[in-house]
Amino acid sequence: MPVRQLPEQVINRIAAGEVVERPASVVKELVENAIDAGASRIDIFTDGGGRRKIAITDDGGGMTAADLALAVERHATSKLDDEDLLQIRTLGFRGEALPSIGSVARLSITTRHKSEPHAWGITVDCGDKSQIVPAALNQGTRVEVADLFHATPARLKFLKTDRTEAEAIREVVRRLAMARPDIAFTVAGEERAPVTWAAALPGAPGQLTRLGDILGTDFRSHAIAVRSERDHVAVEGFAAAPALTRANALGQYLFVNGRPVRDKLILGAVRAAYADYLPRDRHPVVALFVTLDPREVDANVHPAKTEVRFRNAGLVRALIIHALKEGLAREGRRTAANDGGATIAAFRPAFTPPRPSAGPMNWDWQRSPSAPIPRHDDVDSMPPAVSSAAFAEPMQAAFDVGGPRADLRLHEQPAAPDMLDRPLGAARTQIHDTYIVSQTRDGLVIVDQHAAHERIVYERLKTSLAAHGVQRQILLIPDIVELDEATVEALLARTDELAAFGLAVESFGPGAVAVRETPSLLGKINAAGLLRDLAEHMEEWGEALPLERRLMHVAATMACHGSVRAGRRLKPEEMNALLRVMEETPNSGQCNHGRPTYVELKLADVEKLFGRR
């Protein structure tokens, strides 16, 4: 077949295949045009998931008759001149949207510029343009799209259900509305109640108001303001505390110069910033806005303009991580999933009262036997409070190791008044040799002793690594650990990373390694269990994971093995010392795996459980 020039109509339909993927793509292009036109209000109406009808009305600048005639031609735009392609400042710039839509649907445009005595209208039906005629409309533009893809019926087969396509449209509008809280949006149609987002005040308060309207009150109550700036690149926005997470990354909204994007670089930076706070299967909720010189970012790398390319991607990534980490650290205890709401909701009545009966009750409280509650033998000799120095010691010899118990012991030790005013209060008891119950001035706190100490050890390992290196203890007799060949190879390939944390490992013949040094901070540890866990994690990492993240994984695994275990009995002074160190430790609200280290219940919550409120 000889080479030939394609007809203009076929060219437009090919272009439409890149620009108009589904009804949501049409809405995105048209709403972006309205935003670029300076609209303060945009109304969106759809029917049949956008297949039957899409109508978008704005109060922007509108177009003259001459501009309207050019607007439906390919590559005709008012947003770009010969020198602007490398410094794009508008959402749209290619001039492809309207002719592409008009080539696969019935397009109708009515518009009025303030300089015109009346509005003008034009229709485009599968590429066939009508004459421009006078029309009725106030200042602004109304664009209607009917029978989408009726010129290319094969494309209809790839669309989802009306409900799915309608939800995709709403998601597009949500993202655009987040970026412009100063514009009012209304989404109607699909036999659903209209959704309206009123224009908000400028600045961070207005931004948070709009985000709360879209993402819900949970996000607003958990939102943490973040900001970082360097070399004319600014990152700001709001990030949810780790108490609010999702099972996927769909709750991460990213914007570059006001443009909603899906960028793997930014998503990776968000994940890295939350790595110390969330379990691997949970994802944070954030809305981040990156602002930089348009010449430093290329927005012309994707047909749908949903991806960008940064000139200095490393700087953008570093600023995002710094902004999020600084915000999470600044909020301190608020970042923990420690509120008692979910805890209260999980409570159930301990028993169902028996129905009244004619016969006598066969259970007598006074005659019912009861076992005495076991206590520490030395409870009377315990001091009322101790400093956190006991927990600051590297070794954990102060802990009395014991087997798991399912008892509940009460330490009737009066707490110093000032301890009740501390954030985590005064320790009152330990239950199941795993949880510490403390009393505060207005409630109580339940602490997971292993999770709490794990975070403390982890933060100390990180601090030591950043400052002067982790102190080591040389073993008089090296621990010989037998492992399979693959595990040995994985460990020996990372000896430098392990050495950074004070773990000296070397080969000891086939299928074995010798551990000659361990971190002093961990005290006596189960070297075999630690090495097996490290090897398993290393197999997952691969070479793609940055060295910094690999080191943090090593630290987290070591902290888990070097922390006080569940099932270990603690003395009152040890429990109080742990609480005091928690109050001084960054990020102590979560363990290294993202689980909460404590839950706080206010007295009012407890009173609700018993019907006192």
From Swiss-Prot:
GO process terms (BP): mismatch repair
GO molecular function: ATP binding; ATP hydrolysis activity; ATP-dependent DNA damage sensor activity; mismatched DNA binding
Lineage: superkingdom: Bacteria
Claim: DNA damage is one of the keywords in the record: yes
One annotated Gene Ontology cellular component of this protein: mismatch repair complex
Pfam families in the record: DNA_mis_repair, HATPase_c_3, MutL_C
This protein's UniProt keywords: DNA damage, DNA repair
Family, similarity comment: Belongs to the DNA mismatch repair MutL/HexB family.
NCBIfam families per record: mutl, PRK00095.2-4
Function: This protein is involved in the repair of mismatches in DNA. It is required for dam-dependent methyl-directed DNA mismatch repair. May act as a 'molecular matchmaker', a protein that promotes the formation of a stable complex between two or more DNA-binding proteins in an ATP-dependent manner without itself being part of a final effector complex.
Protein name (database record): DNA mismatch repair protein MutL
Lineage: Bacteria, Pseudomonadati, Pseudomonadota, Alphaproteobacteria, Hyphomicrobiales
